[in-house]
Each structure stands twice: as structure tokens, then as C-alpha cells.
């Protein structure tokens, strides 16, 4: 599913990209540029910010609707002047479509086609047309966009070919080509479609002037309008020949173009005279040539009087308009012109109105161009371009003059910086420098929400910074990381605090909510939309919790009349089991769903998971043991999940059982029995003898009816949670799921955790196949691609593709979070110590188990083993199922040990592991696995030595020897003095000599190995001679310290 980019949103909202970028920044969503992608949840929030803009941008302005009055505007009588439209610089526009549509409401008062009559009074509809936004080119029904050849309203003669338009620019609409055939073939007249003039309109058949009238119109100017005032969107024609054209049949003999020998007006932007030569007299008021200066008070072309009109070539003559343009003739940087009216663009026969920049219109608008003639711009009141003709640009392939006197619209010139670019440059200059790099800082309150396992690249994108700069800053803060490495929350907090940002790591629940929102799945909205009519009663979900060996599974076995304890290794539960039993209550058979959780301390996560999905918790406490540590922990889980608790006092048949003691102990934890005035139900049961079971089930149903609203919508796609998962050799991945709402059917496309697929089969707790599972029904699901983790949510997707995409995104999130969690933060000090002390010892493990919950519990228990920082424990792979050859290959490559929990390898795999020397350990009880791994970790520790004092000797006399130096005559006060042991000299309690060695030890004249307390001896300390009487010589040795 393609993501939407910022500029696409800006186009949809009808605003500029920088407005959308600024809005995203205000919303706390920092994006780098207009080409950055935006997530669907952010798009929805953004659309709330632009409710009207988005709607206006998607509809064309009503001012440009073509109406049935189109033939009426074709009469070249008095009409309103060209109305300037708000330019749309980023969109190519056909030449001046907006004025053509805007001038529709002005009816022509005279049916005679007299273009010489100026329009003195413009129509009152002009101001609204100026305020109308310029619509997109595809939505402009301007006449210039319609080819003239197939127009049905115009009675064109037969044999009139439609020449394809010459591509001159993005704003050029289709123009009719030259008409080589037939006398009287009309060119584009004032008001005809395809003309570049702003008032051009398609005439109706009844309003069209006869061809015989054309020779009488001697008041038309000869030649082209200057190019300096043309809108930038007009096409540029290169060096098409612009000389005299042969006469047209029906016209008085091909009159030559006046001024043909002179240079083409508009050719030189630096010439003193621009535009068309005057036909008669002086310009009014002696003003400069119109079209020369965009800032002049007078714009547009005065209408010269007299002179024959040049005509295109007849049949058999040279191709009118010159050769077809090619890319070499095009200007270097064509820019998009103003759609609508340029400066002074006037309708034929009407005075030109001013364009942008405050310039007023000229004395009169020009005529539309002829087919086959040179194309003129739509601005400046001159003659509009001739469709199909050559450009009015300079000759000699020297490029156009556009931009020489300012730009009528379009993108800024290369090198000119936008306001946004200047602002970013200013912010970069003002940004404080950390470690030699400048990064934009926050104000200390700016909140950045970052997903789990994000990298520095993600962080840099949020604050619009360079990832390399963040790597440098992090290095100066004492942390080493790459730009794409997944980092933990502490590292981001450190970096955010330095840069002035408040870092918030998105919780897994929020990540899941945003992920599903990208696929238009909102679970919260589904729950809110459900009414009372949609809900139906469902069975209660009851979790059995308590301390290990207090009889939880035995109690469930007694309720279900089965024997699960015998199947569990070591007699302790190491999986979550889900069952459903039916109890008759008040004459109605009511099902109850039971979830059995382990009680060992290693299964804390399982108990917490069981408490989250339950409605009622049964706290099992042995009457002989009382309240134990895991009892308190299970109680805290249930209270944290805010579920009602029913206490089952088990083993009341044992000798020494005291149920009242249990009631008293639980009072300290806010569980007050009903007989003591509380609201908690206590039931005395004996799982071994089967007593009190009915009372327990009745207590569960009474609690459910009294304090819970157990209803769910079963008429929708299933939603729920995966309680347990395992890999079956014949069935593949098998997930035990609990449906919380909706109904799960065989054949549904399901996604559970990182696994997805279609439900191939569903089995109940007895192994029987079921076709559907209603709310509160636990079933085993077959057909997933991988084993889901215990506690993963599952849902039914609309199709397989959506399920696969959700699973892949979940997998990526979990992988990044796991990488961030497994990353060992290496500071510069740690790195230096590692270099000095050598390689850090690491124990690599590969965990394989029979269930996802068991593997998770084993991994958590192993990571809790604390043996110091010198040894590192790494779990490089974990999985559900038997040990495979791939596991052995990974163990060979990484020097790892494989731990199998309730699994065994194939014979071939075992032989392969023996050949490769891979150590595989198998365990069926979690205690043994934890103890062995802890012993292995301690074996990797380097030995620690501690100082053990051997004895002390007091110096009584000093003997000086030239051969041995000073020798101390001493009396052993305590312990013993041993030859070659370490020694130090103490003088009045202060160490004067340390790290010495007793090199000689004699008893009288005999060498001695050791001298005990109460004996005298002579001690030589080698080269150390600073000895005095009453000094104390203390001896010690370094002994290895046991690691524990």
C-alpha cells in the first residue's frame, strides 16, 4: 500500500507544501521535506485541520463552468476586459481560459461582428472572477483547450485538417493548425477558440461573420505582439521563419506584413523600442512602448488603425508557420505562465485590464492569433498566438526574452531561495553546536514520540537533522552507536535531554493501535459502536492462580474429571491450559471457561497474562502451607487487572490443615471473607477427594452474575488473544486462542502475532473438531505460518493480503524492539577496559521448547541470573519445536550451547551435532535448566583472589650483613611466618614497605621453611633495608575466592 507524500496532500488540500509542513510540525509530526511520506493516522488528523481547503481543492471554481451561453459570447461586440485570475504557478495552464469563462455573463449588445468597437463598460461579474481560485488545468473548460477541427458548433468547411499542436510549453492548449484547403478557410478570429487572447470564445453558427467581411477590416494591426509581456506558460517557438506569408484565398491578395524588413518586435529585451510598430500617429500621451516595462502604468497594445491583414499560405505553398519546432529550439528553462490574463491581456475590441503587479491595461486589447501564424503570449494586450504557428521569440536560436523584465509567474529562478529555505538556513546557523556539529535544538518541552527499537535515522527524520550529526553528538556523550542501529529508551532519553526534547517511547499497545489504523481497523471504535441489541451473554473466563504445589491443576482435573498433572514433567504446570466445563446452575446449563496458569516463580509473565484475559480469578491456597510468595504475586496480578477474586482453600483434608489461618492471612491483603464481614467468597475444597467443587463453581457463577456484565458481540469478525502456542510435528504451528468477541470460523483469514494464514481446522480441549468458536471459547487453531507468542492478539483480517502485511509489520516492530533490548550499551570507559582486559567472556545459548510460553519463561529466568559484568549471557536464537539442523549450524558458527526444553532432536540431527562437537542439553523441568546455566556462567568467570593473613613478627634487633643486607631478628607474635610469602612492614600502624617477599628465613643458623607463633627467627627481605626495632612484619598470601 503506497504511502502518501506531503506534496500530494498539499495538492489535495489546495495549499502549498510549506503550509502542510508547518501544520505537521505544530502537530508534533516532524517530516523532512515535501517528498516525505506520512502515515495514515497522521493523514486523518491532518485532514481534520484542512476540512474546507481539501474540499475546495477537489472542486473546480464555479466561475469557470461552461454554460449554454457559449455561442452568445462569440459575438465580437463590446465585452468586458480580461479579468486577471489568481495564478497557479505550479500547474501548467492553457492560454487564458479563465477570462473566457468569466466573460460569459456579459451579453453582446450588437449582433454585428464589429471588433473595432471598444468595450467601454466591463461587466459587473469581473470582481468575483478575480477572486475565484484558478482551477486545475484538467478542470478548466476553456475554449483554448478544445481543438478547433472537431468542434460541432462551427460550420467548418470540408477538408479542414486538424494539425496537432506544437508543444511549446506546459501551458499551451491544443491549437488548430493551418488550413491549407479551400477558399475562405477561416483562421482564428477574435473570440475563436484556440486563440491566445484572453477573451477568446467559440462563436455560434449564427454569430459568425461572413468571410466577405474580412477584407473590410482594415483596422487590424499587422504583426505580432511583443514577447516581453507574454505569460511564462506560453509556448516558445524557437527560430521558426517569421517572414511574409502568401495570401489567403478570399483575402485581398496576400498583403505583406508591415515592417517585414525590420527586426521582429520583442526580439531584443534591451532594445529601446519594444512591441509592435505604430500604424498611425503618436501613442497617446507619448507614453513608452506598451509591454516594455511590467511596472509601467500603461500595459497592453494600442489598436493601430488601417493596413491589410496578413493571411496564411494557400494550398500548395510552403508550410505556414515555419518548420516544426524541436527540442533545440526550446528555451533553456521554460516556466509555467499565468493561466488567465497576463498584464494587460485584453479581449479583442476591449481595453486591456491590468495584470499582477499593479499594471493597468493598455488602450485596447489585441486580436486573437491566426492559425498558422506565430504564437504570441497571452499577456500585454497584443495579438494572441496563432495556433499551430511559430513562436514570437527572437530569431537565431538565441532563446526567449521571458524573465528579462520580471516574471509573470512560475517557479523562482534557480539560485533564489524560498522563505522556507532561508528560514531553515537561519535556524541551522542559530543551532547550538555539540561536538562540532550543529543540530536544531528543542525548547525543552517539545515532545517526540518514538517507537520501540527506533534508530538514530528515525530520530533525525523527526527533528529534520543529519543522522551523522547525531552519531557525533552521541559519541561525545559517551555512547557509541551507528545511524541504523536500534537503540533503547535510555539512549534516546540521554540524546533528547542534550538536544532539548522530551522523549516518549510509544507503548506496544499504541504501536498496535497505529498499525491497525493503517489498515482501517479500529478496535476501540468497534466497541463504542456496539449497542445493547448487538450484545449477547457469554460464559465467564476464570483463571486459576496460586503458589506452586498448592493443587491448582489437581483442582481443575477434579472439575474436568481428567488427569493433567500426570502429563506435566516434575508434577508442576509449565504451560497455560484452557478448558471449558458445563455447570448446571438454577436449572440452566452454563459453560465456564477455565485457564490454568503455572505457579512457579519463573512463570510470572504467564500469570500476568492469564490475569489480563480473565473475568474472575480463583486464588488457590493450601490450608497447610498458608500464604506463600507466589500466592501474593498472583494476588497482585489479579488486583492489578481489577478482576474479582474467589479464594479456594485447598487440601483441607490433610493433617494439620487450618483454613481459618488462611482467611486471617489474606485479610492483610484486602481479601476479607464474607463470614468476617467482607465481600470475598472463600470456599473450602479438597481436590484429591473431590469435596466442595460444586460450591466453588456456584461461587464463581454468583460472582459473575453479581459484579460482571458478561456480554459480547458474536456477529462480527473474531478478535481475541493467543494463550499458548506450540509446534506440532504433524500439524505444524498450533495456537491455543481465546475468542473475546466475534465468531471465528474455519476458513477465516487470521493474523496472530507474527503468524498469519487461513484457519484450516479448529479443535476443542478434547481434540474434537469444531466449525466455529463463539466468545469466551478456547480452541486450538491450525493453519498459521509461525507459532504466535503467548499473549499475542489475534484478529480476523478482510483478506490474506491484509493479514500478511499486518503480520510482517508486527514482525518488524518486534525485531527492532528485541534488537534494542538485546543491545549492550558500550561506553567509552567500558570499551577501554575491554581493550585492556581482553575479550569479555560470553555464553551463547539457543533455546528450543515445546511451547512459546515455556521458552519465554525460560529466557526470562536465565536473564535474571546475576554473575557480574565479566560474563555475558546471550540468547542468539529461540524457537518452538524440535532441535533442527539449522540450529546446529548456528551453534557451530557462534560457539553456542543448545538447550532443549521438553523437546528432542531427530537422530540425524543428533549425529550431526556430535560430529560438529555441539553441546545439546535437554531438560524437562525448568529448575534444572536454570541451575546448569548458572553453573556454566560461573565457570566462565575469571578467578578472584583475596588476601589471607598468615602471621605477624615483631622486630627485636637488626643484624647488618654485607652479603644479605639488613636482617631482622624477630619474635613471631601470631600465626606463622613462611618462606617466599608476601610481606609488608608496619611502623606504628603505618605501612612503610609493601609488596615485599620473605627471601630468607632462618632459625638460628639453619634454614627454615616456616616458623610458628612464639619462636624467634631471622627474616631477610631482600633489598629492603629500612628496618627499625619495634617494626612489625606482616605476612600474607593471595588465595582464590570462590565465585557465587
UniProtKB/Swiss-Prot annotation:
All copies of domain tr-type G, residue ranges: 537-709
InterPro entries: EF-G-like_DII (IPR053905), IF2_II (IPR044145), IF2_N (IPR006847), P-loop_NTPase (IPR027417), Small_GTP-bd (IPR005225), T_Tr_GTP-bd_dom (IPR000795), TF_IF2_bacterial-like (IPR000178), TIF_IF2 (IPR015760)
Pfam family name, one: IF-2
Record region (Disordered): 31-425
One Gene Ontology cellular component: cytosol
Biased amino acid composition, Gly residues: 168-185, 339-409
Family designation: Belongs to the TRAFAC class translation factor GTPase superfamily. Classic translation factor GTPase family. IF-2 subfamily.
Name of the protein this chain belongs to: Translation initiation factor IF-2
Organism of this sequence: Kineococcus radiotolerans (strain ATCC BAA-149 / DSM 14245 / SRS30216)
Protein's gene: infB
Amino acid at each position: 500500500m503506497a504511502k502518501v507524500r506531503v506534496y500530494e496532500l498539499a495538492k489535495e488540500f489546495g495549499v502549498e507544501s510549506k503550509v502542510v509542513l508547518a501544520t505537521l510540525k505544530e502537530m508534533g509530526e516532524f517530516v523532512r521535506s515535501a517528498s516525505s511520506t506520512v502515515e495514515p493516522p497522521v493523514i486523518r488528523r491532518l485532514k481534520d485541520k484542512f476540512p474546507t481547503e481539501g474540499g475546495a481543492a477537489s472542486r473546480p471554481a464555479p466561475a469557470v463552468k461552461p454554460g449554454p451561453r457559449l455561442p452568445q459570447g462569440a459575438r465580437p461586440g463590446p465585452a468586458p476586459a480580461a479579468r486577471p485570475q489568481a495564478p497557479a504557478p505550479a500547474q501548467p495552464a492553457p492560454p487564458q481560459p479563465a477570462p473566457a469563462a468569466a466573460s460569459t455573463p456579459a451579453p453582446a449588445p450588437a449582433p454585428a461582428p464589429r471588433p473595432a468597437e471598444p468595450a467601454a463598460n466591463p461587466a459587473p461579474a469581473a470582481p468575483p472572477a478575480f477572486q475565484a481560485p484558478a482551477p486545475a488545468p484538467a478542470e478548466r473548460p476553456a475554449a483554448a483547450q478544445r481543438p478547433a477541427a472537431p468542434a460541432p458548433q462551427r460550420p467548418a468547411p470540408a477538408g479542414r485538417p486538424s494539425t496537432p499542436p506544437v508543444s511549446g510549453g506546459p501551458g499551451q492548449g491544443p491549437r488548430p493548425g493551418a488550413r491549407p484547403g479551400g477558399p475562405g478557410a477561416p483562421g482564428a478570429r477574435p473570440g475563436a477558440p484556440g486563440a491566445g487572447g484572453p477573451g477568446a470564445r467559440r462563436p455560434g453558427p449564427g454569430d459568425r461573420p461572413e468571410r466577405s467581411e474580412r477584407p473590410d477590416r482594415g483596422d487590424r494591426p499587422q504583426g505580432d505582439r511583443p514577447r516581453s509581456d507574454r505569460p511564462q506558460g506560453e509556448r516558445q517557438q524557437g527560430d521558426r521563419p517569421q517572414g511574409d506569408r502568401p495570401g489567403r484565398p478570399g483575402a485581398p491578395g496576400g498583403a505583406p506584413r508591415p515592417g517585414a524588413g525590420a527586426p521582429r518586435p520583442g526580439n531584443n529585451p534591451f532594445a529601446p523600442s519594444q512591441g509592435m510598430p505604430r500604424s498611425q500617429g503618436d501613442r497617446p500621451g507619448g507614453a513608452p512602448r506598451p509591454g516594455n516595462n511590467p511596472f509601467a502604468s500603461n500595459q497592453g497594445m494600442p489598436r493601430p488603425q488601417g493596413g491589410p491583414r496578413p493571411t496564411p499560405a494557400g494550398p500548395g505553398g510552403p508550410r505556414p508557420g515555419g518548420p516544426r519546432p524541436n527540442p533545440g529550439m526550446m528555451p533553456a528553462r521554460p516556466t509555467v505562465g499565468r493561466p488567465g490574463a497576463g498584464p494587460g491581456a485584453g479581449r479583442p475590441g476591449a481595453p486591456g485590464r491590468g495584470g499582477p503587479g499593479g499594471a493597468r491595461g493598455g488602450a485596447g486589447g489585441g486580436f486573437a492569433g491566426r492559425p498558422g501564424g506565430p504564437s504570441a503570449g497571452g499577456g500585454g494586450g497584443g495579438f494572441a498566438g496563432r495556433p499551430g504557428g511559430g513562436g514570437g521569440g527572437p530569431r537565431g536560436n538565441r532563446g526567449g526574452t521571458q524573465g528579462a523584465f520580471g516574471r509573470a509567474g512560475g517557479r523562482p529562478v534557480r539560485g533564489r531561495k524560498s522563505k522556507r529555505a532561508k528560514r531553515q538556513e537561519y535556524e541551522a546557523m542559530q543551532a547550538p553546536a555539540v561536538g562540532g556539529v550543529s543540530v536544531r535544538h528543542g525548547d525543552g518541552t517539545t515532545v517526540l514520540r518514538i517507537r520501540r527499537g527506533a534508530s538514530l535515522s528515525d530520530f533525525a527524520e523527526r527533528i529534520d537533522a543529519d543522522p551523522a550529526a547525531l552519531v557525533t553528538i552521541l559519541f561525545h556523550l559517551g555512547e557509541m552507536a551507528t545511524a541504523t542501529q536500534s537503540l533503547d529508551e535510555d539512549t534516546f532519553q540521554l540524546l533528547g535531554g542534550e538536544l532539548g526534547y522530551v522523549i516518549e517511547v510509544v507503548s506496544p499497545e499504541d504501536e498496535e493501535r497505529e498499525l491497525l489504523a493503517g489498515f482501517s481497523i479500529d478496535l476501540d471504535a468497534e466497541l463504542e459502536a456496539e449497542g445493547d441489541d448487538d450484545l449477547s451473554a457469554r460464559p465467564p473466563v476464570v483463571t486459576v492462580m496460586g503458589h506452586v504445589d498448592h493443587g491448582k491443576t489437581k483442582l481443575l482435573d477434579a472439575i474436568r474429571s481428567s488427569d493433567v498433572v500426570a502429563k506435566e514433567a516434575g508434577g508442576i504446570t509449565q504451560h497455560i491450559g484452557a478448558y471449558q466445563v458445563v455447570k448446571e446452575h438454577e436449572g440452566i446449563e452454563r459453560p465456564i471457561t477455565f485457564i490454568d496458569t503455572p505457579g512457579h516463580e519463573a512463570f510470572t509473565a504467564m500469570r500476568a497474562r492469564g490475569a489480563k484475559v480473565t473475568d474472575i480469578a480463583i486464588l488457590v491456597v493450601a490450608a497447610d502451607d498458608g500464604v506463600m510468595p507466589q500466592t501474593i504475586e498472583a494476588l497482585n496480578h489479579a488486583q492489578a487487572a481489577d478482576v474479582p477474586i474467589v479464594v479456594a482453600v485447598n487440601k483441607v483434608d490433610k493433617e494439620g490443615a487450618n483454613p481459618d489461618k488462611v482467611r486471617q492471612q489474606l485479610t492483610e491483603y484486602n481479601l476479607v471473607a464474607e463470614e468476617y464481614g467482607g465481600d470475598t467468597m472463600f470456599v473450602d475444597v479438597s481436590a484429591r477427594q473431590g469435596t466442595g467443587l460444586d460450591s466453588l463453581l456456584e461461587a464463581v457463577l454468583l460472582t459473575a452474575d453479581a459484579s460482571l456484565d458478561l456480554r459480547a458481540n458474536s456477529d462480527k469478525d473474531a478478535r481475541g488473544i493467543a494463550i499458548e502456542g506450540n509446534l506440532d510435528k504433524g500439524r505444524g504451528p498450533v495456537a491455543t486462542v481465546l475468542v473475546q468477541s466475534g465468531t471465528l470460523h474455519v476458513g477465516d483469514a487470521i493474523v496472530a502475532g507474527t503468524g498469519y494464514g487461513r484457519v484450516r481446522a479448529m479443535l476443542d480441549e478434547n481434540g474434537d473438531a469444531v466449525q466455529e468458536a463463539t466468545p469466551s471459547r478456547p480452541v486450538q487453531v491450525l493453519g498459521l505460518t509461525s507459532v504466535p507468542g503467548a499473549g499475542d492478539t489475534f484478529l480476523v483480517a478482510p483478506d490474506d493480503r491484509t493479514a500478511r502485511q499486518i503480520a510482517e509489520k508486527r514482525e518488524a516492530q518486534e525485531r527492532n524492539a528485541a534488537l534494542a533490548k538485546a543491545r549492550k550499551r558500550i561506553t567509552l570507559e567500558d570499551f577501554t577496559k575491554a581493550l585492556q582486559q581482553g575479550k569479555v567472556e560470553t555464553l551463547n545459548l539457543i533455546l528450543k521448547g515445546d511451547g512459546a510460553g515455556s521458552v519465554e519463561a525460560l529466557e526470562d529466568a536465565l536473564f535474571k541470573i546475576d554473575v557480574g559484568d565479566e560474563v555475558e549471557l546471550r540468547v542468539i536464537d529461540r524457537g518452538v519445536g524440535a532441535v533442527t539442523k539449522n540450529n546446529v549450524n548456528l551453534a557451530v558458527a557462534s560457539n553456542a550451547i543448545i538447550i532443549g526444553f521438553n523437546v528432542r532432536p531427530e537422530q540425524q540431527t543428533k549425529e550431526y551435532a556430535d560430529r560438529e562437537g555441539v553441546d545439546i542439553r535437554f531438560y524437562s523441568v525448568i529448575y534444572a535448566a536454570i541451575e546448569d546455566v548458572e553453573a556454566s556462567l560461573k565457570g566462565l568467570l575469571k578467578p578472584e583472589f583475596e588476601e589471607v593473613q598468615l602471621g605477624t613478627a615483631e622486630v627485636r634487633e637488626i643484624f647488618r650483613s654485607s652479603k644479605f643486607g639488613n636482617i631482622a631478628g624477630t619474635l613471631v607474635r601470631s600465626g606463622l611466618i613462611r618462606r617466599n610469602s608476601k610481606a609488608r612492614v608496619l611502623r606504628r600502624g603505618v605501612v612503610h614497605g609493601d609488596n615485599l617477599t620473605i627471601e630468607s628465613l632462618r632459625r638460628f643458623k639453619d634454614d627454615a621453611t616456616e616458623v610458628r607463633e612464639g619462636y624467634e627467627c631471622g627474616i631477610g627481605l631482600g633489598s629492603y633495608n629500612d628496618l627499625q626495632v619495634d617494626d612489625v612484619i606482616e605476612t600474607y598470601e593471595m588465595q582464590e575466592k570462590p565465585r557465587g
